[in-house]
Amino acid sequence: MTTILKHLPAGQRIGIAFSGGLDTSAALLWMRQKGAVPYAYTANLGQPDEDDYDAIPRRAMEYGAENARLIDCRKQLVAEGIAAIQCGAFHNTTGGLTYFNTTPLGRAVTGTMLVAAMKEDGVNIWGDGSTYKGNDIERFYRYGLLTNAELQIYKPWLDTDFIDELGGRHEMSEFMIACGFDYKMSVEKAYSTDSNMLGATHEAKDLEFLNSSVKIVNPIMGVKFWDESVKIPAEEVTVRFEQGHPVALNGKTFSDDVEMMLEANRIGGRHGLGMSDQIENRIIEAKSRGIYEAPGMALLHIAYERLLTGIHNEDTIEQYHSHGRQLGKLLYQGRWFDSQALMLRDGLQRWVASQITGEVTLELRRGNDYSILNTVSDNLTYKAERLTMEKGESVFSPDDRIGQLTMRNLDITDTREKLFGYAKAGLLTASSATGLPQVENLENKAK
């Protein structure tokens, strides 16, 4: 069976991930006119720039959908977002600022839940708006086939017939108007935006040029913290975790995790927390640039890692970062539910996250400027009295430290001999700007 269909399968049911925007609206109407039987599926991901989800399926029916469903994906999305925080599943960082993989998390949820809904309706052909140059076409492909082994893929944007007729936004708008729908193109922004409850992605158009900065972006989850005319008073916030799960913000608990994430977004968003500018490597190994918002994810991540560093030992923290980066890359590639990702997730959640219980108090200022004011946990292995610089009882004595330092003589001697060997091999050259002349002198004295 051919998995990818290059031309419209007339007479067959086709499920389309329907956003209500111009592209998917024109595609749905065009497919119906060409003889297909389109079914529309809209994911409610808590998009901050969408205020009427119920209207989207109604529009799909007007454009010719055989049926249209709104699938509430918010609970699952937040669950996956919390799992990513617990695992540190983030691999793109620039200058200490993190991209929280919010789009890949959204695709993992959308790709599985929408295809599952299609399967219930007997729809085994799926289309969406992803282009052939991006990451999403592969993410949706993988998640779709994981959910339904019989799935076939039809994308209007890979169909030359569709492209020849409706290859641009102007043509699509004219097509909608000609068919009796007064669908005017929205005002063109200098970039495109994709969002869900966890974060927003701004990319393409002017943002493809590196001399266009964050200053051209209008945040949809936060504020323009770079604009000095925007007043942003400092704010203290306390985040509580229990066994790796965020349970309270400023002492307030929530009926469900969706409400908790919305409040975290509101708190972080008031300051522009979690906004970053990243150059990343797409799945096809070409570089792209995006500006990201994730105020709630950033707030929870900061508090989580503060507790992590106070609770776990050095090697565990190192493995958390190493495995988290691996897992973040798998998530980015659309492999969040692959066996290698599940293995990493299980270990990080079982042995690391389960011990993260406590509270962290932060002072948020502008953008990513914050201070940690207090850290409280019964699980802390950080104990001030163990290494206090003040006089008092100590867990070890000066003689103990002398013995420990003496043991270091073995590896110091080994390192010195290696440096001599490197110098003799010409790999190191003595220079007045380095300590190597002294090493040579020591070698001569040893002779």
UniProtKB/Swiss-Prot annotation:
Keywords: Amino-acid biosynthesis, Arginine biosynthesis, ATP-binding, Cytoplasm, Ligase, Nucleotide-binding. Gene3D superfamilies: 1.10.287.400, Argininosuccinate synthetase, chain A, domain 2 (3.90.1260.10), HUPs (3.40.50.620). Its EC number is 6.3.4.5. GO terms for molecular function: argininosuccinate synthase activity; ATP binding; protein homodimerization activity. It catalyses: L-citrulline + L-aspartate + ATP = 2-(N(omega)-L-arginino)succinate + AMP + diphosphate + H(+). ATP binds at A17, F18, S19, G20, G21, L22, D23, T24, S25, A43, G129, T131, D136, D194. Pathway: Amino-acid biosynthesis; L-arginine biosynthesis; L-arginine from L-ornithine and carbamoyl phosphate: step 2/3. L-aspartate binds at T131, N135, D136. InterPro entries: Arg_succ_synth_type2_subfam (IPR023437), Arginosuc_syn_C (IPR048268), Arginosuc_syn_N (IPR048267), Arginosuc_synth (IPR001518), Arginosuc_synth_CS (IPR018223), Arginosuc_synth_type_1_subfam (IPR023434), AS_cat/multimer_dom_body (IPR024074), AS_multimer_C_tail (IPR024073). It comes from the Bacteria. Transmembrane segments: none annotated. The keyword Lipoprotein does not apply. GO terms for cellular component: cytoplasm. It is found in: Cytoplasm. It holds the Pfam family Arginosuc_syn_C. One of its GO terms (biological process) is L-arginine biosynthetic process. L-citrulline binds at Y99, N135, R139, S192, T201, E203, E280. Homotetramer. Belongs to the argininosuccinate synthase family. Type 2 subfamily. HAMAP family: Arg_succ_synth_type2. This is Argininosuccinate synthase. The gene is argG.
